[in-house]
């Protein structure tokens, strides 16, 4: 793919997918790759992982998932690159790279968040890179978009 010629406008969905979010209100997704990543098995797994581990046992309102958090990070990254001076320095291919990296940044998290990592001496960042570059649905989607795109996204992590 010619990175310089890639245009986000040309690949937009005709109808954006809208996610209702407790923090950001509405999160619009209009890029097919982003929507495909959201629908992947690896991203959907994050719906069952609490953002704050076992904290919800003490604070009943601390119920949000890694999935919701990842959508929120995607939303903020998207807002930054389209509504600020930062975006002026990025071409559309770079913008999509940033949005994918933001969405996938926590995909390697296990149950009970960082407590699990501490107990078993694991690193979610390393698992995130393994998921993005390994034999996964996420990897296949990124590579289908453009050969080498999975490594480009993981290099941002």
Predicted feature descriptions by range:
Residues 104, 108-109:
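Short active-site segment of divalent metal-dependent hydrolases/proteases
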């Amino acid at each position: 793919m010619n990175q310089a010629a890639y245009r986000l406008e040309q690949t937009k969905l005709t109808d954006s997918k809208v996610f209702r979010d407790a923090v950001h209100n509405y999160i619009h997704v209009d890029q097919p790759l982003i929507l495909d990543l959201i629908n992947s098995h690896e991203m959907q797994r994050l719906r069952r992982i609490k953002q704050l581990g076992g904290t919800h046992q003490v604070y009943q309102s601390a119920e949000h998932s890694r999935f919701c958090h990842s959508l929120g990070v995607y939303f903020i990254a998207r807002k930054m690159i389209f509504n600020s001076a930062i975006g002026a320095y990025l071409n559309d291919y770079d913008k999509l790279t940033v949005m994918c990296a933001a969405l996938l940044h926590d995909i390697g998290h296990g149950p009970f968040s960082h407590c699990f990592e501490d107990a078993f001496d694991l690193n979610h960042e390393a698992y995130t890179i393994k998921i993005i570059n390994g034999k996964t649905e996420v990897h296949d989607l990124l590579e289908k978009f453009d050969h080498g795109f999975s490594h480009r996204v993981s290099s941002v992590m």
